[in-house]
Amino acid sequence: MLKMAGMVPVGATLVEAVGLLQRGGLDCQHGIIDWVRTFGYGDVAKYTLDYPLGLSGPALGILMNRDAWKNFTPEQKKVHVKYGAWLSAKMAIGNFIISNEEALNTVVKDKGVQLVKVGSAFDAIPENYKKVQRETNIATAKGFGVQDPAVIIDYYEQAVERWRPVSKQIGRDIDKFTEVLVREVFSKIDPDKL
């Protein structure tokens, strides 16, 4: 998608990006707004695009080593699944929404970062990319031996559409999101089968 917007993607760590931005080795950096505050990008990068370009990292509430999981008692597994729902909700709303808005307000006020509105012509870029991304993901999955990746992608896209109205009802309520995650996802998990 970045190429479609006229950008040239390069690989650099978050820390390396600071020096590259300072020396002109990078013109821009794709990531969450909180990085502008936490990594000091706001000292040199004075503009941020007011347009959602997608998630730059995993929104997972719990990651664990399989051996550690297997060594848990059934009760410990249940506790982790129970609080995994809350942690997922807290990360999604607290980190990816609220914390990023607070970071934006901070860097605008303290660092002089300007929020740049994009024209409606930019809307076509993510839409066109969805088609390219689908084909790329299908080819990549087939390369890993997935038999029919289009079915998985279709199911995922249907799930996203099913969750859109639910998300609007939840708003920014972490407890409400936790309840929905428990009902729709976590209550269907059998910890002993993980």
Language-model-detected regions and their locations in the chain:
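N-terminal secretory/targeting leader peptides
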Residues: 1-194
